[in-house]
Amino acid sequence: MQDTSKQYDAVVDTCKSLFIKKMGDYGSAWRILRLPSLTDQIFIKAQRIRSLQQNDVRKVDEGEVSEFIGIINYCIMALIQLEKGVVEQPDMSTLEATKLYEEKVSVTKRLMEDKNHDYGEAWRDMRVSSLTDLILQKLLRVKQIEDNKGKTIVSEGIDANYQDMINYAIFAMIHLNEDKS
């Protein structure tokens, strides 16, 4: 589990670094996005990953890793939007956004550690394609919850689904990094 924690942190560092750089380029323009818009952005990334996994020919020179980073960062933005609400104008400094980013990652990592303990790191025996499918399944669930105006009868809420997608994407990146080495 110690290895998992270090690997998890390394993936998060990569994602957070890109998030901060994009905050420098664009500011917090993402703060105007409603949750369904963020969900759709994540869906596009996950669909592209699935297409890359199924097709041999690529017309755009970006691989799975950059798409998984996008999924992680968009999910964290969605968690921030759930907490802070949508705004009409960008309103957040890089410092404040980074602090919120780190808070969301911390809670999500704790969830991963708890589930990892209970499931015995079962994700290590899963294929990246299966993790991609789980992300797509979670996205379909989130879309349904959004269509139901956020109401669920017995299921966990949108935030838990975003957290699971973050963890699945991080697991996929750990697998892809291990395959490289």
Q: What do the PLM-derived regions correspond to, one by one?
A:
Residues M1-S181:
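Intrinsically disordered, low-complexity regulatory regions
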